[in-house]
Amino acid sequence: VSVLSFVDGNTIKIMSSAQDHKRAKDGDQGLNTGGMGNFSPSPFYTDEVDAFCKKYVYQATVDAMKAEGRPFKGVIFFGLMLTPEGPKVLEYNARFGDPEAQVVLPRMKNDIIDVFEACIDGTLDQIDLQFEDNACVCVVLASDGYPLAYEKGFEITGMENFKDKDGYYLFHAGSKFDENGKIVTNGGRVLGVTCLLYTSDA
């Protein structure tokens, strides 16, 4: 389970949970990747997990960094493994996750600029961070052969289908404009096709 957070050096505000799928192929098969898809919220991030992490992980991390003389402001990504003994922290990242951000941020009600300014100013405790009571899913379109060898330079078509469609997003990653102004593939993970859902049962 992935959990993103905003931090202002003292206060930490937790965003909604997300669940990443790392394997390159369907059915949880193939090599590990940077993430082939994600959805938010994660059904495995229960109230019990949330309470445990708020007590032992989130604020404790912020307090420890401050105690070491390096208070942190920005975004902290918590990569959690849920075990019979309770949640374990597998990794920290000082950034948004990809594709976690693609499914968490569309659900956020707050203006992200207000939240960032609060992180900078040390006033995050005054922000009531809220998320829509819905779900969001992102499927990554990857180049054939990823995460090993793959070709680049293939034209990407069909993007016009996302125009003026509320709740649908197309996030670019491994893409670029070629010399003719066409958008072509330029990496392994090319696009994140994302949709807001009214229910996670959909």
Report residues per predicted region.
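FAD-site-proximal beta/loop scaffold in flavoenzymes
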Residues: L170-K176
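Active-site "cap" helix and flanking loop/linker of ATP-utilizing ligase/carboxylase catalytic domains
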Residues: K54-I76, N93-K165, D178
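Internal nucleotide-binding/catalytic subdomain
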Residues: V1-V104
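C-terminal alpha-helical interaction appendages
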Residues: K176-N186, V190
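Short, surface-exposed beta-edge/turn micro-motifs
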Residues: V1, N134-V137, V190
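Hydrophobic side chains in beta-strands
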Residues: S5, L82, L141-A142, H172, ...
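Conserved small/polar residues in nucleotide/adenosyl-binding loops
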Residues: Y198-A202
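Short, well-ordered beta-strand elements within core beta-sheets of diverse protein domains
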Residues: N38-P41, V140, R189-L197
